[in-house]
Curated annotation (Swiss-Prot):
The gene is dcd. HAMAP family: dCTP_deaminase (MF_00146). It holds the Pfam family DCD. It comes from Methylacidiphilum infernorum (isolate V4). Homotrimer. Catalyzes the deamination of dCTP to dUTP. Belongs to the dCTP deaminase family. This is dCTP deaminase. SUPFAM superfamilies: dUTPase-like. Its EC number is 3.5.4.13. One of its GO terms (biological process) is dUTP biosynthetic process.
């Protein structure tokens, strides 16, 4: 059991299309030379990008936030080059990359320090064995001020961990509720 390196990630992308699209190295600048929050392959992980699709939490209906009966009207949907998250609120987004996780691997996804140092916290649950889809990203603004997130730039790092043995039942085999998700996905039961 251990954390996989850039060579393993690159090999899994070539053989099994584990990450699509895939950036072979860390990207820090756009073609025009302007800086971006880095994304792409790193030494022991992959820095995923956030897409242009966002759902910003507003609670205009004064709903109780209930994971068993979540009201999707609590979100305002938008597509943009950036997302302004209200103070002490959050947004959902999705990764640019589509992931296919091997049966004997689980991932941990951690927010990039560039955002964390600004009070913007990213939460993503592990990508389980044989899970496949776009990752839904939870982005919290812990500050008393509006916070800006840049689409098509790095948001979080995925670390791939080798299991000591393959699992008995994979996420796909138990028909996980977030299997093959395409867009920003709100809570499901």
């Amino acid at each position: 059991m251990g954390v996989h390196s850039d060579d393993w990630i690159r090999q899994m992308v070539k053989k099994h299309r584990m990450i699509e699209p895939f950036e072979e190295s860390q990207v820090r600048k756009k073609v025009d030379g302007s800086q971006v929050i880095s994304f792409g392959l790193s030494s022991y992980g992959y820095d995923l990008r956030v897409s242009r699709e966002f759902k910003i939490f507003t609670n205009v209906f004064n709903s109780v936030v209930d994971p068993k009966a979540f009201d999707p009207r609590s979100f305002v949907e938008m597509e943009s080059d950036c997302c302004i998250i209200p103070p002490n609120s959050f947004a959902l987004a999705r990764s640019v990359e589509y992931f296919r996780i091997p049966r004997d691997v689980i991932t941990i996804c951690l927010g990039k320090s560039t955002y964390a140092r600004c009070g913007i916290i990213v939460n993503v649950t592990p990508f389980e064995p044989e899970w496949e889809g776009y990752a839904t990203l939870e982005i919290s603004n812990t500050t008393p001020l509006p916070a800006k997130v840049y689409a098509e730039e790095g948001l979080a790092q995925v670390i791939f961990i080798q299991a000591s043995e393959p699992c008995s039942i994979s996420y796909a085999e138990r028909n996980g509720k977030y299997m093959y998700q395409k867009g920003v996905t709100v809570p499901r039961l």
